[in-house]
Amino acid sequence: MNSIAQTNQSEKQLSEKMQYFLRRYHVSRILRSANAYKLRGLPVLSIFIVAFSTIFAQRSFFMQIHLQPGVIPFAKDTLYRFMNSCHIHWRRFTTTLAATIIQSTIAPLTSADRVNVLILDDSVYHRARSKKVELLARLYDHAKKEFSYGFRMLTLCWSDGNTLLPVNHTLLSTENP
């Protein structure tokens, strides 16, 4: 008698929940609106699903390939080309996805008189051990009151007082060290 591994069951649950999320929020339509089109080979959604699942499986893409050989139908170059494509508007994708989640899930649960706000946060993204990273800057952290090396991460979030949903983010730096 063979026992079923816990990781197999959790991966199946994860896959089902991801499929539900992708269908409910029409991620394929949002990807198309962000100019993510198939040029050749595999559909864009299948590449996105693999990238999305590796994050929630807490593995790198490299480990995913080695742990499950033959399951992923493309090479790592395909994923890296997809993620680094200059034609895909990733900010439009994250903003549209956040708006869809807010309109279809969060807004019906809250009352109409509740005030919605946009929160703009600029935190320091520390890269203390890095020396030769492009555009690495010496920044002053106002919370810790000290200088450190890193980037300024500007984050836009939506909130209704109880729920906080990140809408978009960007890393900022200066060319002056």
What are these regions (language model features)?
Residues 1-177:
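Conserved, well-structured functional cores that handle cations and Mg-NTP chemistry
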